[in-house]
Amino acid sequence: MKLFTGLVFCSLVLGVSSQWYSFLGEAAQGAWDMWRAYSDMREANYIGADKYFHARGNYDAAQRGPGGAWAAKVISDARENSQRVTDFFRHGNSGHGAEDSKADQAANEWGRSGKDPNHFRPAGLPSKY
């Protein structure tokens, strides 16, 4: 009986461990997807493409699974919250006002929910992106 109980316990522990391993792997890949979208946005330097890259990064990350979706939400929220903090110090045309932040979060959620990020793609953005 002790052997059976030990085997059941070990299988439960290993099952949970593999789920955490999978979640962490998805989260790391999702973080990489977010970084790639950010890098592409900086490289493209295309006016009006911000929301597209927000949606694309979140979409790509969420496609990885629950870990990727979690990473996308954490990174997106941190980015928007840090921009709100900088709003106190940067006035004028910083482009990080409350309206812009709400629009960014809407694009983030759009992508995370699995909807097509091309909805936000501006006309003329090179096909590379």
UniProtKB/Swiss-Prot annotation:
GO terms for biological process: acute-phase response. Residues 1-18 form the signal peptide. Gene3D superfamilies: Serum amyloid A protein. SMART domains: SAA (SM00197). Residues 112-129 form a propeptide. Keywords: Acute phase, Amyloid, HDL, Pyrrolidone carboxylic acid, Secreted, Signal. Induction: Upon cytokine stimulation. The modification Pyrrolidone carboxylic acid is found at residue 19. One of its GO terms (cellular component) is high-density lipoprotein particle. Residues 88-129 are annotated as: Disordered. It is found in: Secreted. Expressed by the liver; secreted in plasma. InterPro entries: Serum_amyloid_A, Synovial_Prolif_Regulator. Pfam families: SAA. Major acute phase reactant. Apolipoprotein of the HDL complex. Belongs to the SAA family. It is linked to Reactive, secondary amyloidosis is characterized by the extracellular accumulation in various tissues of the SAA protein. These deposits are highly insoluble and resistant to proteolysis; they disrupt tissue structure and compromise function. This is Serum amyloid A protein.
